[in-house]
């Protein structure tokens, strides 16, 4: 039977091997068969972790972005994560889902008390977009905050489509508030007060490979469906932005300080390629990310 997730994972393993690709392909095919046959071959434990957890969501996002297949947010976990612990958001998401269920599949909903994943996904996406559209209603600095959320979302949308899966489920970032330009610092404070961006309570490691702690931020998770960003946090790579880059993302709709190349991770300033223009494919509303439909 076809298994696009396993096939893509196999290709990823081959690409990361430094030996002969043909031998690597035969080896990973053997490991895959052993994993599904449950015969205990060496390396099946690592393959199992990559297949069921580490890369499953990232691979699903990538495959769906290539084939323009819908990705779905649905279920209690998705609603809880997207709500960011905000009771109002949680209730509004549930209300929107029920309202859509009564409109699109009333008989099924009344008979079974259940809502299909497609209807849940549509409702969550629409609510996410409506919340994003409301950012400009913030009287002070609303347009700047909208620019910032848009640019950050575009960056992580690009990360999620990386063909080598170097940034699986990356959705957090780092910057120094004290080093910002005075007005930019004020804008960030307004954005935080409205929970448009959220600061982690405790400083965390910047990246898995750098033993340095810093303040970690993310945009409100209710916006994640717009940009096809996983609500899970892997924390392997948290790109760091300078005050000039933060200023650019606040003041321009089309500012992208990071451009992915094929060789390096953007873990520090020396590994970033600047690009003040946005890749035309960065903002893609082709559908919804989160709890993926693996069918």
Stretches with model-predicted labels:
Residues 1-29, 108-118, 180-189, 218-241:
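Repeat-unit-sized solenoid/scaffold elements
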Residues 1-15, 69-104, 182-197:
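P-loop NTPase catalytic cores that bind/hydrolyze ATP
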Residues 1-67:
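Long, low-complexity, polar/charged, intrinsically disordered or flexibly structured peripheral segments
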Residues 21-24, 28-32, 36, 71-73, ...:
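Winged-helix-like regulatory helical subdomains adjacent to P-loop NTPase cores
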Residues 36-37, 68, 112-113, 228, ...:
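Short, flexible coil/linker elements and helix-boundary hinge sites characteristic
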Residues 77, 92-96, 103-111, 202-213:
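Composition- and surface-driven signal marking solvent-exposed, interaction-prone regions
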Residues 166-295:
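Long, compositionally biased intrinsically disordered regions
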């Amino acid at each position: 039977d076809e298994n696009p997730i396993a096939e893509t994972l196999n290709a990823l393993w081959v690409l990361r091997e430094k030996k002969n690709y043909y031998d690597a392909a035969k080896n990973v095919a053997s490991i895959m068969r052993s994993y599904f046959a449950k015969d205990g071959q060496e390396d099946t434990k690592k393959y199992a972790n990559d297949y069921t957890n580490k890369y499953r969501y990232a691979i699903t996002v990538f495959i769906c972005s290539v084939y323009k297949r819908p990705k779905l947010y649905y279920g209690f976990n998705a609603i809880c994560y997207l709500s960011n612990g905000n009771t109002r958001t949680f209730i509004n998401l549930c209300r929107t889902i029920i309202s859509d269920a009564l409109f699109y599949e009333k008989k099924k909903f009344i008979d079974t008390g259940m809502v299909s994943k497609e209807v849940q996904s549509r409702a969550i996406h629409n609510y996410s977009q409506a919340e994003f559209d409301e950012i400009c209603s913030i009287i002070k600095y609303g347009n700047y905050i909208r620019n910032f959320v848009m640019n950050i979302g575009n960056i992580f949308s690009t990360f999620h489509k990386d063909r080598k899966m170097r940034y699986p489920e990356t959705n957090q970032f780092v910057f120094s508030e004290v080093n910002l330009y005075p007005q930019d610092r004020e804008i960030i404070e307004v954005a935080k007060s409205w929970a448009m961006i959220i600061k982690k309570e405790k400083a965390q490691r910047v990246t898995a490979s750098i033993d340095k702690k810093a303040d970690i931020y993310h945009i409100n998770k209710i916006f994640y469906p717009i940009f096809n960003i996983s609500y899970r946090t892997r924390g392997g790579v948290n790109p760091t932005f300078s005050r000039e880059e933060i200023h650019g993302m606040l003041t321009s709709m089309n500012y992208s300080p990071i451009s992915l190349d094929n060789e390096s991770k953007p873990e520090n300033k020396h590994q970033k390629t600047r690009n003040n223009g946005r890749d035309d494919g960065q903002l893609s509303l082709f559908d919804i990310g989160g709890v993926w439909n693996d069918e």
